[in-house]
Curated annotation (Swiss-Prot):
Binding site for GTP: 376-383, 424-428, 478-481
Subcellular location: Cytoplasm
PROSITE patterns assigned: G_TR_2, IF2
Span list, region G4: 478-481
All copies of domain tr-type G, residue ranges: 367-538
Keyword Nucleotide-binding among UniProt keywords: yes
Region (G1): 376-383
Protein name, per record: Translation initiation factor IF-2
A Pfam short name: IF-2
UniProt source species: Nitrobacter winogradskyi (strain ATCC 25391 / DSM 10237 / CIP 104748 / NCIMB 11846 / Nb-255)
InterPro entries reported for this sequence: EF-G-like_DII (IPR053905), EFTu-like_2 (IPR004161), IF2_assoc_dom_bac (IPR013575), IF2_II (IPR044145), IF2_N (IPR006847), P-loop_NTPase (IPR027417), Small_GTP-bd (IPR005225), T_Tr_GTP-bd_dom (IPR000795)
Biased composition (Basic and acidic residues): 115-174
The protein's role, per its UniProt record: One of the essential components for the initiation of protein synthesis. Protects formylmethionyl-tRNA from spontaneous hydrolysis and promotes its binding to the 30S ribosomal subunits. Also involved in the hydrolysis of GTP during the formation of the 70S ribosomal complex.
Name of encoding gene: infB
Amino acid sequence: MVDTKNPGDKTLSVSPTKTLTLKPRVEQGTVRQSFSHGRTKQVVVEKRGKRRIGGDSPGPEPAGTSEPASARTPAAKAPPARAATPAAPRAGSGVVLRKLTEDERSARASALAEAKVRAEEERRIAEAEAARRNSKEGIEQAEREAAEARRKAEEERHRQEEEAKRKAEIEAKRRFGQTESKPAPAKTTTTTTRAAPPARPAAVAADGSDEDEAPRLVRRPGGPARPVIAPKPAAKPAPAKQRGRLTLVTALSADDVRERSIASFRRRTQRLKGHASNEPKEKLVREVVVPEAITIQELANRMAERAVDVIRMLMKQGAMHKITDVIDADTAQLIAEELGHTVKRVAASDVEEGLFDVVDNSTDIEPRSPVVTVMGHVDHGKTSLLDALRHANVVSGEAGGITQHIGAYQVTSPESGKKITFIDTPGHAAFTAMRARGAKVTDLVILVVAADDGVMPQTIEAINHAKAAKVPMIIAINKIDKPEAKPERVRTELLQHEVQVESMGGQVVDVEVSAKNKTNLDKLLEMISLQADLLDLKTNASRPAEGTVIEAKLDRGRGPVATVLVQRGTLRVGDIIVAGAEMGRVRALISDQGETVNEAGPSVPVEVLGFNGPPEAGDRLAVVENEARARQVTSYRAHQKRENAAASTSGMRGSLEQMMSQLKTVGRKDFPLIIKADVQGSLEAILGSLEKLGTDEVAARILHAGVGGISESDVTLAEGFNAAIIGFSVRANKEAAAAAKRNGIEIRYYNIIYDLVDDVKKAMSGLLAPTLRETMLGNAEILEVFNISKVGKVAGCRVTDGSVERGANVRLIRDNVVVHEGKLSTLKRFKDEVKEVQSGQECGMAFESYGDMRVGDVIECYRVETIQRSL
């Protein structure tokens, strides 16, 4: 290769005095423009030269050889074709290129092949991208079409609504005679169109053009300077004066049609409503729910009537009321029926509908076990008989060997294999309520009578309870193993109370048994099963449970516990239950054997855990569907309970006998007590016994009575009223005992109810006023009256009867009238002070603070004895 150097070639060199630069292609200059009114403006003018690629040409081409611009433009835009052979050397450069070798050719061929492969790969990628873009565009197109369809449907709906509104307006106008007047045809007038203003020149010469019309050039790097086109100014709004004017042009213009405002449409609607209200309205008959008491305003709202009309009707009946007054259900029903409405009477007690006594389906009824209550007099062997049947020993666990709770047990008959539920009731006089409760929930009563004791008062009471409950009886004549037993005497005594056994021609079954020797127990169970078969006891076990609370207590570790006898349905863990004013969810079920069970069927006694508070014994238990229903029932019952308590303690005027009894209780002394018991039944018995102790002078005042242990709040209450605390089979906790000791509050514990009643009776007897008894000592007659200076008047007397003692009480009697009562201060015989003067002797006597004594008066001497009373 030969390198040649021409003298005309420019050299590229690096020197310390010069920089590496390119020649500028743009020449700049300034031009001053002159405008009217003496204004001038200096404008920068650029002169841009054409950039040439290649060698320097000696001079510009002649005009004849140059091609037009339109012919050169496509050639300039077309891309240069790839040369298969190397390009020829530039003319005049003096460079000679060598020929390519075979290796270079093959390398270039492989490079071209690789370029083709890459181009093909890029083409496939571009096609895939185009296909993906097309699919995306298709989805977007479908979405746009769906949106367009929804928009059209919405427009169609709006159009239909507008059409319906327009038809309604036309119909309203037609009904009320408000037809719109047709607009008068517009007069055809010839208008002269204004000549368009002359167009402003786009550009002016440099010597006379306006500065605002001169185009501005924006130079961007790499491109020519382009003029910037200013945006067209927005049309100015018409002046405020001309905006409200109605001209011929605006009237004929379709774009400036005035639409009706919302306010005018609202006013027009109000006018139409006003006209429509003048028409007579149709009477709407409603079903009005009327409770037991309702205000006039609420009644008017439920009838959709005016309260004034209701008050006017009441005035016609002679009653003056305000809208806030409460009227009874009968008056509200009368008013509603006169106004043409139907009445539905409801009461607050409706929340209890459907809880009990729901009729069962005959297909779901199944046989159930009998419930047997054991009743009788105290110490006649009721619990011992049950122990013999259950093969247990409950008597040894009872305090004092007497039953003070209701117990419920299940026994399996050895002959038939059927289960029998036994309920053991106390036989003492204090437990009347327990026996009555046991008789209500039972199917059969076993009356236990001791063969050596006969019929006793509680035996008669049990007979009356069984007759009141209308349940059959089986007479169990117990203790036949004793030598003094006389069963025939028992049968004879029962005849006096209209109980005739089979051996005497009656229908009552009697069995002679011995609980101690377990004699004839199988025969007793057989008679119970036979009697149950005759009763044909059946129930539905698949329905929600119903039962009765036999006993309730507050256990410190387990909370409120209720002994429940399930009578219908099945009670399960998790059921929501209601008993009296208490509710809860069943947390656990414990059988009579102490085992935890998941469910309890009909005639099964269980202990239920989960109540919010201990219910009262005798309350009926029911399972409800949800807690909301349970809260409704319990709130109603609690409200009724509060109302009954308020009515019993209120000062309302009653009969004359009640007023007299209230006057007697004014001066009565109260013995304040706080009583806590283990179960509800024992608490009832204690309260009943203490209530019977009260007299017109003293009575037990029960400040608080509850089930559970003695707490610190009980001690605080007792301190405020100076009361005593009695715990029956319960104990005080550590804090309560410490507080009672600190404040001097007496806490007494009892396990036998009779000991409790006796101690309270003695304490109440101490509040009674003692009885004063007078004992006559003797009489003395005044013979003479002496006046002694230091002593006063002294009466000289002779004792006519009995004796006279110094310090005794005396009465001065004059003409058979008592004129003074006092004490004898001085008793002298001759001049000596003596303690006593016998009959027939003379003595001198002086009274305390009294000196009006006369001859012939009689002095009566007596002694007053104080005798303590008891209840």
